[in-house]
Amino acid sequence: MNVFWFIPTHGDSRYLGTSQGARAADYDYFQQIAVAADTLGYEGVLLPTGRSCEDAWVVASSLIAATKRLKFLVAIRPGISSPGLAARMAATFDRLSNGRLLINVVTGGDAAELEGDGVFVDHDTRYEITDEFLHIWRKLLTAAHTNDAIDFEGKHLSSKGGKALYPPVQNPHPPLWFGGSSPAAHEMAGEHIDTYLTWGEPPAAVAKKIADIRARAAAHGRQIKFGIRLHVIVRETEEEAWAAADKLISKLDDETISRAQASFSKMDSEGQRRMAALHGGKRGGRAELEVYPNLWAGVGLVRGGAGTALVGNPEQVAARMKEYAELGIDTFILSGYPHLEESYRFAELVFPLLPNRRNKVSNGPLSGPFGEIVGNNYLPKAASSS
């Protein structure tokens, strides 16, 4: 089971929908979160993309030297950048980080934002462009290992004598990740993607996605891995966790929720539509927003994209993660508000309950973790593992 964290380059806070409890989204803060994730044993971090956040490539590049083993899941944007430029950027990043790059393929689902970036095509055409983009991108980086040139002629994109002179460390190229819920997205994932990402829908819905994409991948003679993107609110007791969930949205008013939902409704993203359907755009208590045991839709009232959180005590959160893992999910990309503190909280409370997590961080005599020395002489008693 792989666990990733999240760099909140669009801002961070203790509350949603208000400046109260907010903190500056600046380099020092991003670095603190990245170093924490690296030290605590998270496999990697996701960096968001779009006009609502800082540029993912610039931020991720700035964090390479601050980390040792952390992987970076960074977006390429078919339709906005050329496949040749994206291939060179990926190769350089992979070389400078010694193979720590993962690629998040983002077609985009907000027509207003896409048009602002100069992209004026409909939903299915975006996926046609993405398909051709990935054919070129993959061929360029694969050919870079043998110093060969490539040709490709498509309906939307072409390359004649394309060449990447510097190959990536990962062969043939950094792994491709992607999330999308439409039939066109599933077909594209089946043909090109190494790890398919879903937002945190209830297990039955996730199982249907996995089955469909596995079948599409098999039709292309491929196998594919699966990941899920979720927020997490974990506390030592269930009561504390649900109180924290209520507190997170306690500053929201109806106007803020309405404005956010109106913005989301203009998108042509099937995934965003499915997120909105979980809460119906209406604030409520646990009874209204707990859409499956320990799965809470409150975040999606004002946050685009991933809008659900696992809420509960450590055992409940771990049990729900294991339930998703039994469906075929092997990577969990998590986040919590505020992101620095919650990266520690989750690692401390839940990592010991997950398979293959105990030895991710060195526990040698000088590195701990063992707590503050007692009486200037003794290590604290070891915590019970039961």
Curated annotation (Swiss-Prot):
Question: Which Pfam families does the record cross-reference, listed alphabetically?
Answer: Bac_luciferase (PF00296)
Q: What keywords sit in the KW lines?
A: Flavoprotein, FMN, Monooxygenase, Oxidoreductase
Spell out the Gene3D superfamilies in the cross-references. Answer: Luciferase-like domain
Q: Which GO terms describe its biological process?
A: alkanesulfonate catabolic process
- Which residues does UniProt call coiled coil? none
This entry's Enzyme Commission designation comes to: 1.14.14.5
- By its UniProt entry, which InterPro entries does this protein fall under? Alkanesulphonate_mOase_FMN-dep, Luciferase-like_dom, Luciferase-like_sf, SsuD_RutA_monooxygenase
Catalytic activity reads: an alkanesulfonate + FMNH2 + O2 = an aldehyde + FMN + sulfite + H2O + 2 H(+)
**Family, similarity comment:** Belongs to the SsuD family.
Looking up HAMAP family in the UniProt record yields: Alkanesulf_monooxygen
What's the protein here called?
Alkanesulfonate monooxygenase
Q: Which gene encodes it?
A: ssuD
